[in-house]
Amino acid sequence: MFYRHLQLNELTVTGVTGDTKLKHVTAPVSIVSPQVLRATASTNVIDAISHQPGVSQLTTGGSISKPIIRGLGYNRVVVMSEGVRQEGQQWGDEHGVEVDGNSVNSVEILKGPASLMYGSDAMAGVVILHQQPTLAEGEMKANVTSEYQTNNGLFAYHLQMAGNQNGFVWDASFSDKMAHAYKNKYDGYVPGSQFRERAGRLMLGVNKGWGHSRLVWAIYHLTPSIIEGERDPKTGELEPLSNDLKTYGRSLPFQQVKHYKLVWDNSLNLSSGYLKAIIGYQQNRRQEFEESPDEYETFFKLHTLTYDLRYVTNEFDGWKLSTGIGGMYQKSGNEGEEYLIPDYRLFDFGLYATATKQLGDRWMLNGGVRYDHRHLKAFPGFSMLNGQEDNFSRNFGAFTGSVGAVCNINEHFNLRMNLARGFRAPNLSELGSNGKHEGSLRYEIGDKGLKPEYSLQADLGLDFTSRYVSAQLALFANRIDNYVFLHHVGDYTEGTGYGYSVYAPTYPVYAYTQGDARLLGFEAGVDFHPIHSVHFSNAFSYVDAQQMHAAPGTKYLPFTPAPKWSSELKWELSHHSHPTIAHHHTTDAAHRSLLNNLYVAVGLDCLLKQSHIYGADDTETETPGYALLSLSAGTDLQLHGKKVAEFYFTADNLLDKAYQNHLSRLKYADENAVTGRRGVYNMGRNITFKVVIPITL
């Protein structure tokens, strides 16, 4: 949320030119602190940050979420974890982010293409997942976290142990999470919504005066069942896939996702600045089982090698410079009976240089330029439904840039301005898809002739801070040439290659197309704190996404988030320092108190009706508005002035409202013949209990 903006301004942002104070960043940035992450009830890390202004999630059930920033997602958002870009075949609706949420300490969200460090796919922005920082010299700590959610019986635990002895640092953790089917007022328990998640992480390294060198190994396993949404034609009830809808075991059909990551992170301190080099290897194995739990129909195996070399200078005469090169090599293959995309190889690289300049006490200027090149080659494997060859080769390249300024008008007002040019090469799914997606309930067809996307985005922000009120306004205008999107192409007609495939007769067919688009929107927030212990925070997000020069029914871009207003009244019942401040100063009274950092909060999330839809060929439908009431509380338990546990309680959808989010893929499942309602609804009332036990060794 937007509260306590003055203290938040002192935080350091890493996703721009080196490490920069938030108050000096010209582009829009949101930061999610460790305390907010721990206190937020969620099923995955993207779900946890989806409450941030301008951020949404595309969901398939309770376990799969994809980040959407200002109406843009998929390969337009780069997710960074362990210092490398997360590569998990993110082109699919039902392909989430393969990162253990318990391993994430804080999150940076960069909105728009202003940061030049991340390349082609960062047109919409970047989500940077920061893991726990290394401990100070001589420290050893452990951490035990346990969580339970009532709606889907989610049970999770997380074990972590870390230390720093004579500069040798380590951090080991293991997480396990399981959930049975979730329920709502209209559908009851939803068959196929159960999942199981396991993850492990090990970091070994050295921290010295010359810098650091760390090796990280991470593994992530997710087994979500697939919600098909099929109904009994007589009763309208969802057809159960097993006799026990509260089982934690998998049921057909289901996915099995395994993601492995090895990262070597190095930083060398120099007299003039520092040099950073990160090399990463990832393997993503994604299987779908439809008829038998022992025989997969689809099996994608993706190998990714990433590299990043960066040099950042110390500040001199108000200047700070950064330059670098980075890129990746990918090899993807199909090992299943069914194909969605052809085998392919990809190689890309990018060169960039950025600069910031402090002008007096009021102005901070920054700018930069980047060049990207990408080569992609698809190999023969199957015949494409639209008659195109399934083997092709494409090359893409472009220059991009950004320029911005921050003006500290006075002690109360801060003005931010930024203009950025973005670029994105079409991904392999957009160019070469030809198959049914069991998890997204459709058949998809690519177009190898698609052009790259180019964007021009302008941002204007104004921050106000006073003793009792803080407010922020962020405006943006984004023009995208050759915007790529999916649209429904109707029933099968012989010779056209579109509609219903003979190989998937029950699946509607969607084809990739493109057109020029413009997106306008804003995020606004205000926090009232008439007394120190009370905060009334409000945030509103809006984006209008239109296709230019389009016919009626195709005017609006498909799957644009609905306008969202979030409000929270929070009462802090005991003294504490703000969670984002590194050093906590505790009073004698706080040392004597059994409960510290005690708070109670009431929240309301209102999503307005989304009537701006791509209605041609029933690509999408309007979504009614709804409001969700929540209640939360939390506290630290202290004994003899030492924190021994943290407790969190959250009740989401307190009134058990039946609703469908506009970005839920389950909204387009089968219609209930009895009620006339289409699709599967989101989760009903859900109460979460979480306990965190820190242990100092």
What are these regions (language model features)?
Residues M1-E10:
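Extracellular beta-sheet/turn segments enriched in Thr/Pro/Gly and aliphatic residues
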Residues I49:
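Active-site-adjacent helical/loop segments in soluble small-molecule enzymes
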Residues H5-L6, G15-V32, V36-T40, T59-P67, ...:
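Outer-membrane beta-barrel proteins, especially TonB-dependent receptors
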Residues L628-L629, L637:
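Strand-loop-strand
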Residues G54-L58:
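A short linear hydrophobic-aromatic micro-motif
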